[in-house]
C-alpha cells in the first residue's frame, strides 16, 4: 500500500479566549503580560469557602459565536466539574460544560464555501494557570487561571492538514468579526487540539485517534498533523496498532511525542457544578444578540463582489481580517471602490509587508489615506506625486496636506503656464518635432518627459496631453 491508499480523519477542538476584561467566575483582570500572580483572586486560587460568580458577558459572547456559526442556542445549559490533578489547576477540577453546552450543531464552510465542516458543540470553560520552568525549578503562575474560554468542537470532517489549517483560519476570522476573541495565537488567545486518525480510503470505520495538544500557530497545525498522519500510516503498515495517546508537538524536531495515555470521559468523573445555577437564556435575549451581529466575512465578501464590482481575489484579501475590512470601509465612504482597492492592496500592503507590520500598526490610518485620495481625485496632486507623498506619510506620519504644502507639490493646472513650457520645449527640439510628424510617434513620450522635468513633475498630465496633442498635430 502507498500513502494514497490512506485517508486522514481530523477533528479540531479550538480554545478561544473570550474578549472579556474579567475572568469567567471572578472579577480579576485578564490583561495580557502582567507580572506573575498579580491577577489572581481568592476564587482563582481556590481558597476554601470561596464561590464562583458567573460573568454573563462571557455567556453572551458564546451565544454570539454560536449564532455566527449558524448553530442552535441551548436555552437551558449548566456547568460541570471535570476532575483531574495538575499543578496549575488549584481547584483540582475544571469548571466546564460537558452534559449541556450553551451551543450545539453549528457549521463553518471552507474551500471557498464548497465544504461544510460540522460544529458539534461550543461550550464555556475556565482556563488553567501556567507552569513556568526556570533551570531546575518550576513555578506556577495563576494569572491565566479562571480566564474564560470558548471551546469550539468540530466533527471529524477534515481530511488533511490543509483543511484543518483552513478551518482554523475561518474560525479565527469569524471570532474576530464577532469580537468574541482577538484571535492572537502568539499571545495564546487562540489555540487548538487536533484529533487525528487514519483509515483506508473507502472505509466507514474510524481508526484509533490521537490528540495533539496546544497547537498555537497555523504552521504548527500543518506540521503536527502531517507528521502524525505519516507516523500512524507507518505503524499500521508495519502490522502494529495505534495507541490512543495524548501528544505534544515538538517544534524543534517537527515530531509529535507522547504526553500521556488518552483519557476517556469516565476518567474525569464529570458531574454538575453544585456552586452554580443553570444558565437560562430567553428567546428575546437570543434575538437581541442576533440583531447585534456585524456583517460576517462571507456576507461582506459577497457584497463587495456583487455591489462594488470587486474581483473575488481582492474581496478575499480585504475580508480576510476585520481590521482590513474596517479600513477599506472607511475609504469607500468617500472614494470609488476600485481606487480604494488599489491604494489599499498595492500601495499600503506593499509598504506594510516591507516593514513587516500589520494594518493595525500602520502609520497611515484610513482617514489619512482618504485625505490623500481627496487631493489626487480633485487634481491637487497627480497619482505619481501621490505615491511620493504616501512614502513620506508612511515614514513620518505627517498628513498629506502638510507634506504637499511643505514640499510645494500642488499640481500645475494653469493652461497658460503649461503652454509656455510646451512651446519652449517644441522650439528647442524642432528636429524631434519633424521626426514625430514623420511617423516616429514614440517621441511623444519624450515631450511629456521634458514637460515633467521642467515642472518638477507637477504639471497636470491631462492638461499636458491636451495641449501637447494640439501643438504636435
Curated annotation (Swiss-Prot):
<dbReference type="InterPro" id="IPR018027">
    <property type="entry name" value="Asn/Gln_amidotransferase"/>
</dbReference>
<dbReference type="Pfam" id="PF02934">
    <property type="entry name" value="GatB_N"/>
</dbReference>
<dbReference type="GO" id="GO:0070681">
    <property type="term" value="P:glutaminyl-tRNAGln biosynthesis via transamidation"/>
</dbReference>
<dbReference type="InterPro" id="IPR042114">
    <property type="entry name" value="GatB_C_1"/>
</dbReference>
<keyword id="KW-0067">ATP-binding</keyword>
<keyword id="KW-0436">Ligase</keyword>
<dbReference type="GO" id="GO:0050566">
    <property type="term" value="F:asparaginyl-tRNA synthase (glutamine-hydrolyzing) activity"/>
</dbReference>
<dbReference type="InterPro" id="IPR017958">
    <property type="entry name" value="Gln-tRNA_amidoTrfase_suB_CS"/>
</dbReference>
<dbReference type="InterPro" id="IPR006075">
    <property type="entry name" value="Asn/Gln-tRNA_Trfase_suB/E_cat"/>
</dbReference>
<dbReference type="InterPro" id="IPR023168">
    <property type="entry name" value="GatB_Yqey_C_2"/>
</dbReference>
<dbReference type="InterPro" id="IPR004413">
    <property type="entry name" value="GatB"/>
</dbReference>
<dbReference type="InterPro" id="IPR017959">
    <property type="entry name" value="Asn/Gln-tRNA_amidoTrfase_suB/E"/>
</dbReference>
<comment type="similarity">
    <text>Belongs to the GatB/GatE family. GatB subfamily.</text>
</comment>
<dbReference type="GO" id="GO:0050567">
    <property type="term" value="F:glutaminyl-tRNA synthase (glutamine-hydrolyzing) activity"/>
</dbReference>
<dbReference type="Pfam" id="PF02637">
    <property type="entry name" value="GatB_Yqey"/>
</dbReference>
<keyword id="KW-0648">Protein biosynthesis</keyword>
<keyword id="KW-0547">Nucleotide-binding</keyword>
<dbReference type="InterPro" id="IPR014746">
    <property type="entry name" value="Gln_synth/guanido_kin_cat_dom"/>
</dbReference>
<dbReference type="GO" id="GO:0006412">
    <property type="term" value="P:translation"/>
</dbReference>
<dbReference type="InterPro" id="IPR003789">
    <property type="entry name" value="Asn/Gln_tRNA_amidoTrase-B-like"/>
</dbReference>
<comment type="subunit">
    <text>Heterotrimer of A, B and C subunits.</text>
</comment>
<comment type="function">
    <text>Allows the formation of correctly charged Asn-tRNA(Asn) or Gln-tRNA(Gln) through the transamidation of misacylated Asp-tRNA(Asn) or Glu-tRNA(Gln) in organisms which lack either or both of asparaginyl-tRNA or glutaminyl-tRNA synthetases. The reaction takes place in the presence of glutamine and ATP through an activated phospho-Asp-tRNA(Asn) or phospho-Glu-tRNA(Gln).</text>
</comment>
<dbReference type="GO" id="GO:0005524">
    <property type="term" value="F:ATP binding"/>
</dbReference>
<protein>
    <recommendedName>
        <fullName>Aspartyl/glutamyl-tRNA(Asn/Gln) amidotransferase subunit B</fullName>
        <ecNumber>6.3.5.-</ecNumber>
    </recommendedName>
</protein>
Amino acid at each position: 500500500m502507498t500513502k494514497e491508499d490512506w485517508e486522514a480523519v481530523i477533528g479540531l477542538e479550538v480554545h478561544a479566549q473570550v474578549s472579556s476584561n474579567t475572568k469567567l467566575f471572578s472579577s480579576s483582570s485578564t490583561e495580557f503580560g502582567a507580572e506573575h500572580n498579580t491577577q489572581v483572586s481568592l476564587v482563582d486560587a481556590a481558597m476554601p469557602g470561596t464561590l464562583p460568580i458567573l460573568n454573563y458577558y462571557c455567556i453572551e459572547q458564546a451565544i454570539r459565536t454560536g449564532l455566527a456559526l449558524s448553530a442552535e442556542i441551548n436555552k437551558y445549559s449548566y456547568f460541570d466539574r471535570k476532575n483531574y490533578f495538575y499543578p496549575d489547576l488549584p481547584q483540582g477540577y475544571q469548571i466546564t460544560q460537558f452534559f449541556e453546552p450553551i451551543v450545539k450543531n453549528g457549521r463553518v464552510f471552507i474551500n471557498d464555501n464548497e465544504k461544510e465542516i460540522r460544529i458539534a458543540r461550543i461550550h464555556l470553560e475556565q482556563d488553567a494557570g501556567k507552569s513556568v520552568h526556570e533551570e531546575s525549578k518550576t513555578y506556577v503562575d495563576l494569572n491565566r487561571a479562571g480566564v474564560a474560554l470558548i471551546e469550539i468542537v468540530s466533527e471529524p470532517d477534515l481530511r488533511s492538514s490543509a483543511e484543518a489549517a483552513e478551518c482554523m483560519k475561518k474560525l479565527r476570522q469569524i471570532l474576530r468579526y464577532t469580537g468574541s476573541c482577538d484571535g492572537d495565537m502568539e499571545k495564546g488567545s487562540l489555540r487548538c487540539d487536533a484529533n487525528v486518525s487514519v483509515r483506508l480510503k473507502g472505509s466507514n470505520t474510524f481508526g484509533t485517534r490521537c490528540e495533539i495538544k496546544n497547537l498555537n500557530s497555523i504552521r504548527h497545525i500543518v506540521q503536527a498533523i502531517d507528521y502524525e498522519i505519516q507516523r500512524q500510516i507507518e505503524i499500521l503498515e508495519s502490522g502494529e496498532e495505534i495507541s490512543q495517546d495524548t501528544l505534544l508537538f515538538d517544534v524543534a524536531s517537527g515530531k509529535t511525542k507522547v504526553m500521556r495515555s488518552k483519557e476517556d470521559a469516565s476518567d474525569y468523573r464529570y458531574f454538575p457544578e453544585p456552586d452554580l445555577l443553570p444558565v437560562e437564556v430567553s428567546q428575546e435575549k437570543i434575538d437581541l444578540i442576533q440583531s447585534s451581529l456585524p456583517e460576517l466575512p462571507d456576507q461582506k465578501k459577497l457584497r463587495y463582489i456583487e455591489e462594488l464590482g470587486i474581483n473575488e481575489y481582492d474581496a478575499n484579501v480585504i475580508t480576510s481580517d476585520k481590521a482590513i475590512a474596517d479600513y477599506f470601509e472607511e475609504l469607500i465612504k468617500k472614494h470609488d471602490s476600485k481606487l480604494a482597492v488599489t491604494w489599499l492592496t498595492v500601495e499600503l500592503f506593499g509598504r506594510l509587508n516591507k516593514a513587516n507590520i500589520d494594518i493595525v500598526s500602520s502609520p497611515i490610518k484610513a482617514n489619512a489615506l482618504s485625505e490623500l485620495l481627496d487631493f489626487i481625485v480633485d487634481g491637487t496632486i497627480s497619482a505619481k506625486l501621490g505615491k511620493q507623498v504616501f512614502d513620506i506619510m508612511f515614514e513620518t506620519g505627517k498628513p498629506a496636506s502638510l507634506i504637499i504644502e511643505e514640499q510645494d507639490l500642488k499640481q500645475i493646472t494653469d493652461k497658460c503656464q503649461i503652454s509656455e513650457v510646451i512651446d519652449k520645449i517644441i522650439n528647442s527640439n524642432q528636429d524631434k518635432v519633424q521626426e514625430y510628424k514623420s511617423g516616429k510617434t514614440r517621441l511623444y513620450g519624450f515631450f511629456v518627459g521634458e514637460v515633467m522635468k521642467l515642472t518638477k513633475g507637477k504639471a497636470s498630465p491631462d492638461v499636458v496631453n491636451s495641449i501637447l496633442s494640439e501643438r504636435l498635430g
